[in-house]
Amino acid sequence: MEAGGDNAVPAPGGVEDLVDTQFPREEAGDSERVHASTLDPGDGDPEDTGSKDQPSSLLSPLPQTEAASSTCEHWETAAASDSSPPGEPESNSEGQGEDPDDGGDPSDEDWRSQRKHVFVLSEAGKPIYSRYGSVEALSATMGVMTALVSFVQSAGDAIRAIYAEDHKLVFLQQGPLLLVAVSRTPQSAAQLRGELLAVHAQIVSTLTRASVARIFAHKQNYDLRRLLAGSERTLDRLLDSVEQDPGALLLGAVRCVPLARPLRDALGTLLRRCTAPGLALSVLAVGGRLITVAQERNVLAECRLDPADLQLLLDWVGAPAFAAGEAWAPVCLPRFNPDGFFYAYVARLDSMPVCLLLLGTNREAFHAMAACRRLVEDGMHNLGALRTLGEAANFSNGPAASAPAYSVQAVGAPGLRHFLYKPLDIPEQHRQLPQFTSPELEAPYSREEERQRLSDLYHRLHARLHSTSRPLRLIYHVAEKETLLAWVTSKFELYTCLSPLVTKAGAILVVTKLLRWVRKEEDRLFIRYPPKYSTPPSTSADQAPNNGLFTGL
């Protein structure tokens, strides 16, 4: 059942509006649908499906058109008839993004049974990455994709998506790279396109956009896997997170570790006191979740770190390569400057899951960064922060190992199983740090299949709320195993999963308790007032802020 549209629900702004809302009746039908009709294939272009405070330019592709579904049938036929023998699994160093248990031949039943495939290839059709299977065995399939794109481009157009029955094929051209998602999940084309953008950003973070363009300008059929060795597993983890824990990509925000505000403020002050030559950004994180961040005025000038870049860093430091000790590596932030590198110092603190990330512009500053690490570590010991974070991490049993979280029982709202909450009423000066919060996934969502099913429901609700053809403000959906309520206002974006036995009146009561609890705990759940960045140096009218300080190694 839905309550939506201009005539159904006035612009809500608080719990009182939800109580007064009259939910229209829904005809008996498939209870698993969010709406009686199927979703509009055109729902949610990237610029409209992002968060309310996210600039549209971050996800806007070039103007494109959609191809007919008959082309998809041609692709499937060609893939099924590919006579290439299954490729032998290669080591990580060879650039395989495959699961060793999955066959590499498109005619293999296990490969075809996957819900979603993601491919990366060059304009010349050279395979670069495949989520499942051997890229060698998929070379003919990728050749068909290249032919489709070239055929549409020859008519002066660009292909965006193909729809055929329960499949979506989404294409994204980024310079010399072509990214393709083939999906039969409930994700909209816009959500899949955002996922492809995240995959491209991960590739750029390793090589930079300028390097990729220069390589293929020199040699169109270059095998980029040589330079991406070791990055495939990172791409695999990124795509897995969308299935298991979609909040960050879906809401365009980062998740913070629940922490008492005085301790968080003290940690922010500690980071600002530790300086090194060329230090640009200091980040404390644990389990892929943000503790606090401090930005250096003199290096970043008027630039602000985009949440997509920050989430990329949080995912990056979660790689097994950084599980112990310290590391020094270049990393590109695609939103900040896709053509240059920072130099990143990554270290675990005191054998704990707490991670310190220091970004700088000086390639010779490793020892200075290591000295900063010792100061931060000593300061956290004095504050008792390592002990506090360690105790919180021991509570977690979720997919993100050692990620401090909280139980949904802390809300004190019987019938509430899970939720995603993103505040939108952030002070204007802090909108560069969109955040969201969600509790630990507990029973009945302890198993991977159940988490995937909940993720599908969240994606479906998000697509309806942010549809370009008929955006909704409020959705009340009764499914077979749970009841869901999604609500977006000028103050927040909320997705709640409730017991299937909850009535409409009960759902309203649960949401009321949840909103009151979030308001009470907001200083602990969010960085409501992030560590004050130093005031940027003033620039004259004829001197634009410099965003390209780092031009590579």
Swiss-Prot record:
Subunit comment: Interacts with CCNT2; down-regulates CCNT2-mediated activation of viral promoters during herpes simplex virus 1/HHV-1 infection. Found in a complex with RMC1, CCZ1 MON1A and MON1B.
Keywords: Acetylation, Phosphoprotein
Basic and acidic residues: bias regions: 23-35
UniProt protein name: Vacuolar fusion protein MON1 homolog B
Modified residues (N-acetylmethionine): 1
GO biological process: early viral transcription; late viral transcription; protein targeting to vacuole; vesicle-mediated transport
Similarity comment: family membership: Belongs to the MON1/SAND family.
GO CC term (a single one): cytoplasm
Biased composition (Acidic residues): 96-108
Keyword Nucleotide-binding: no
Domain of life: Eukaryota
Modified residues (Phosphoserine): 57
Pfam families assigned to the protein according to its UniProt record, in alphabetical order: Fuz_longin_1, Fuz_longin_2, Fuz_longin_3
Spans annotated as Disordered: 1-111, 534-553
Bias kind Polar residues: ranges: 52-72, 541-553
Compositionally biased tracts (Low complexity): 78-95
Source species: Mus musculus (Mouse)
